[in-house]
């Protein structure tokens, strides 16, 4: 595998600390849908659906380059039901979602893959890092739920900040990424021969250097298995895999979500908001 194309990668959920450039993988519970949201024109959205945001947290100077799958290292995002995709203005990547449409129905809950962006000209940040200025006001009383499971309501701090989103470049996932197209049709994104990446790499919009790499909405049991590549400040790369490392690859158990304890029970990595 050429690391320049799909940099092997490293993704970890929660707040696992490492000696390398990757500090954490953070899973943010962004929003929990209610009855009003379910009745929007954006497509079928079951009550109680959870919108998750996944961030790669890196040391200063490091860049997110790619999430990848190759033989022996499956890249997988899955739910036991279906992923929600907004049928009105949704997209497989957020770069194609106009800022002006974010206020419409449930566009803000669309499922997509990212390299830092959250819309056409906005970047994604943790709600807890949002200053609450220029918060999006949703039309017709949508997205007003204050479920404590999701922490800060998005009507107060929406997790968007102005910026130039890095463009997502995909390799070999044209069929797989269709699960995030503008209709709810599937429950699994999987590839063993492809990646989503950003040429030149991307850094986070805050000093913490967290890059948003995906947003997924589902009412099912959400899980993933990730492999990630990040670029070092000196121009090198660090590659992290969920299983079976070879060569210079680094295996990190937290790339599998939810994690499994030694006794076989499952343990959710630390999420935002804290439990």
Regions found by a protein language model. Name each.
Residues 1-24, 268-275:
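Bacterial Sec-dependent N-terminal signal peptides
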Residues 20-267:
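Non-catalytic macromolecular-recognition regions in eukaryotic signaling proteins
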């Amino acid at each position: 595998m050429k690391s320049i194309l799909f940099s092997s990668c490293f993704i970890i959920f929660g707040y696992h600390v490492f000696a390398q450039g990757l500090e954490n993988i953070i899973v943010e519970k962004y929003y929990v849908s209610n009855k009003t949201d379910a009745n929007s024109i954006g497509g079928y959205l079951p009550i109680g659906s959870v919108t998750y945001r996944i961030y790669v947290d890196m040391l200063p100077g490091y860049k997110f380059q790619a999430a990848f799958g190759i033989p022996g290292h499956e890249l997988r995002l899955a739910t036991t039901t279906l992923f929600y995709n907004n049928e009105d203005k949704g997209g497989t990547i957020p770069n194609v979602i106009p800022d002006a449409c974010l206020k419409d129905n449930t566009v803000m809950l669309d499922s997509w893959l990212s390299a830092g962006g959250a819309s056409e000209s906005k970047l994604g940040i943790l709600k807890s890092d949002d200053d609450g200025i220029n918060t999006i006001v949703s039309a017709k009383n949508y997205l007003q739920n204050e479920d404590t499971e999701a922490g800060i309501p998005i009507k107060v701090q929406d997790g968007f900040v102005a910026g130039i989103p890095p463009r997502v470049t995909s390799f070999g996932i044209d069929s797989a990424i269709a699960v995030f197209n503008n209709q709810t049709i599937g429950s699994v994104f999987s590839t063993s021969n492809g990646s989503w990446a950003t040429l030149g790499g991307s850094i986070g919009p805050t000093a913490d250097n967290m890059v948003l790499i995906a947003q997924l909405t589902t009412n099912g049991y959400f899980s993933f298995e990730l492999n990630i590549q990040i670029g070092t400040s000196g121009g090198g790369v660090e590659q992290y895999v969920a299983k079976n490392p070879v060569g210079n690859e680094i295996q990190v158990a937290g790339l599998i979500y939810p994690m499994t304890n030694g006794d076989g029970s499952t343990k959710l990595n630390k999420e935002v908001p804290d439990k």
